Amino acid sequence: MLIVRHRVNSKAELALTPKTLGVEIDLRSRNDQIILEHDPFKTGELFEDWLTSWDHYLLVLNIKEEGLEERVLEILKKFGISNYFFLDQSFPFMQKLIRQGNTRVAARASDLESVETPLESGASWCWLDSFSGNWEYLSTVVPRLNAAKISTCLVSPELQRADSDSELLRLQGIIQRDGLRIDAVCTKKPEKWL
């Protein structure tokens, strides 16, 4: 399972991240530039400047504003980056990319959201989340996604809930118990997944 480090929105954080890991970043616009920033109305580093330090395995692009995708794709092409996927897009923007032939997007399934969306959307990734802490749904969902050749990326529990250590152990137990094939996990705590 590939470990994706969550919210690596600065060159300093990128430098601290082993090159064997993937990274997730947040993208917004400022004037006519794409910046890395999770929260609105803040100043972040320029995406193109950040990419001059990129030499990692997988790039997960969390789009915080609709309509950035075309510009982001131009920048990725300029830097020769092809191992990526888009995350947290609205369904219409996700479908627009898919209709243009780019399936490097993630549709979400969770304990509250049906797996049918990722299965029928044309997305090549599924972002697997839990809003209640109930991860048992993975036992039926993951095999269906695997059979459909849709890559899977878990949202590690600490991204949703601060007190997550016992939940993390339960989640890891479910994965092991059921022999689930998960392709990646996005986490603030890579050491918990090694």
What are these regions (language model features)?
Residues M1-L194:
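Phosphate-group recognition and catalysis centered on beta-loop-alpha active-site segments
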